[in-house]
Amino acid sequence: RQLVEFLLRTGSIDSRFTGFDRANEGARIHRRLQKAAGEGYAAEVFLSGEREAAGIPFTIEGRADGIFTDEAGVTVIDEIKTTAVPADDIAEDMNPCHWAQGMVYGALYGRQQGLEKLDVRLTYYQIDTDDILRFVRHFTLKELEAFLQDLLEQYAPWAQRQLAWKEQRGVSLSALDFPFPAYRPGQRALAGEVYRACTAAPSKSGVRLFCQAPTGIGKTMSVLFPALRAIGTGCGEKLFYLTARNTTQSAAEDAIARLRASDPKLALRSVTLTAKEKVCLHPDAEGHPACLPELCPYANGYYDRVNTALKALLDDGTGRFRSEERRV
């Protein structure tokens, strides 16, 4: 799903159709439809396959909402989608991502089972009226495989970029030096415990560490520095530093800035997650985010622009990227 949505996403952000409650409701409807489909309907089928594009090996994984055999003996991949779009406006080609997701599952399942042809069915459930609409398309395995291969070829430049970045980051972080002339009392011991926790067996997956230290010891750097060094040795991909207050958030940002200042060539990307109420570029009259395409120029057509903006952000290593210029 992530592969398909990353490459094929289009349209606008619309807060009316997103959110935690909406996702939970969608999951409940999925289970209801799957249960009603009967005994011959296999729900939540895990699929995995190995492919290669541009010399890069890929492992594609996902869960098909349902797989069954129809009356003609044809295997059908069922993709269920809940929607708030009025039933009269639901069209077969409403969202290319929906078909693409089912087609990728079809390619994986078809090769796995040695099938020559498969059908993909989209099942739309209208959440306000309980209407159910279904659309079916017929494919050969060759067509589905070609579609998946084309997606991977499109994604390959992004994968190459990420692989190159990981290699650069690993070399940089593994050689990271402590950014101060000396450790404070107790700071080295804490940093050592953090590093051992991050690199502990099995398979360098780490263990839990609970620690308590007095104010002024330099806890932020004592945690960030060894954790980043551990990432440089292949232990983990991302570091999440959670804070309860803005003051401790600033301490983490200052520590990252200090690390960068001590090594101008440091290969490190950091992101501060902030409530959208605080960073919204186009709030409504009451100062609240208005994530509706008809009200916000940033929400309108957002998914048509986001990948171009993301590439520009990754290409700009100086942090001068401005979302206003890209309207994202």
Residue ranges and their predicted role:
Residues 1-70, 74, 100:
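Metal-dependent nuclease catalytic cores that hydrolyze phosphodiester bonds in DNA/RNA
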Residues 195, 220-235, 255-259:
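Walker A/P-loop NTP-binding motif
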Residues 170-173, 177, 235-327:
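A substrate-engagement module of RecA-like helicase motors
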Residues 165-211:
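Conserved pre-motif I regulatory segment
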